[in-house]
Structures are given as C-alpha cells and as structure tokens.
Amino acid sequence: MLISTRMVEPFTIAANVTGQVNPTENDIALIYGAGPMGLTTVQALKGVYNVKEVIVADRIDERLEMAKESGADWVINNGQQSLQDFLDEKGLKPTLIVDAACHPSILQEAISLASPAARIVLMGFSSDPCQIVQQGITGKELSIYSSRLNANKFPVVIGWLEKGLIDPDKLVTHTFNYHHVTDAIELFEKDQRHCCKVLLTFSE
C-alpha cells in the first residue's frame, strides 16, 4: 500500500479526465499513448467505470504490454498497422477517445475514427497548430474536452485505492534511493521502452 499511496497524484489526472466525460459501461474507449497518463486512464476506465472495451494505441510494444497489464482489452502498434484498419477489422467504433500521446496530428484522426456523438479528450500542450475539418465535428455532433489539472481529485483517487479499483503498483517499473536521483532521471529520460514510473526512496 505504501507504493500505491505515493502514486495517487498521477491518477488524479485520470480522475479529472473521466470526471469530465462520465464514462459508461457501454463505452468503447480508444486511448492514444501508453505512457503514465494513458495507463492511469486505462485503469480508471476498466476498474472504476467498467467500460466495455478499451483500446490502446502506441508505437512502443513494451508500453503496449503495460497497457494489457493495466486492463486494456485491445492494443495496437499504430506505427506498424493502420488504426482505422484495425478498428474496422475488429468492428469497433470508439465512443470515447483520449489523446494521452499529445501530438497535434492526432485530433483530426480521432475525429475521423469517432462514432457519432462521441467524446474526445485532449491532454496535450503542443503549441504547434493542428488542422481539422469542422464538418467532421459538427456532422457527428462530437464533444471535445480538455484536461490539464487534477481539479482536487486526490480524495477521489484515495477512494479508488481504498476500494481496490486501481493498482498503481503496475506502473512502477524502477525504484532508486534518493542518493541516486541522477541515475533515476537519466533512466527515465533515456529508456522509454521499459521505464514508466520511477520512485525515489528516502531511507538511509
């Protein structure tokens, strides 16, 4: 439980995202990105909201394995296969899309892939412009949300932990004593394949 309590803050982002879009058990969710934000959102959607199907797209296979461990029903390396083809093959039409990869090109693709009346959540901070076709949004009556803060969601996440609805330990890949903080930072920056969350310990 000690590790879990240290991981409350990352899950507050997922709590803010899901609190805005109000997922249901009938949703088919597509998450771009299997980094910490994407993985916490997977756990929230499956563990808290019992969402019917969760699909995760990423270009790093090791991250996709982490997504499976966090509860994803489907994973796809969209650097190797067309996401549109994959969804068509599986007969899936996303009703909820979360962009946790935060690349400007994703929004237009998400608009194209979304089902009518779907919700799309943006989590990125890119200052680069993205090109979108307005008709794709209004024609499907899509709703677009943004999320950047935790919005006082700590009590919500603590409640999830107490009920056993999420498992933050699955996101912790490395632990370092604080004396080796430089090594921890270097690992986090250089090894995106195997490194997700790095914890520092302060025991002597």
Residues covered by each model-derived region:
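C-terminal hydrophobic helical "lid"/dimerization subdomain
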Residues: 61, 108-112, 151, 155-204
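Short alpha-helical
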Residues: 12, 36, 61-62, 81-82, ...
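Glycine-rich cofactor phosphate-binding loops and adjacent beta1-alpha1 units
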Residues: 21-24, 65, 70-143
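Structural detector of well-ordered beta-strand residues that form the stable sheet scaffold
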Residues: 55, 119-121, 145, 199
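Conserved acidic E/D residue at the C-terminus of a beta-strand in Rossmann-like folds
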Residues: 58, 124, 148
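Mid-domain Rossmann-like dinucleotide-binding core that forms the NAD(H)/NADP(H) cofactor-binding site
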Residues: 1-80
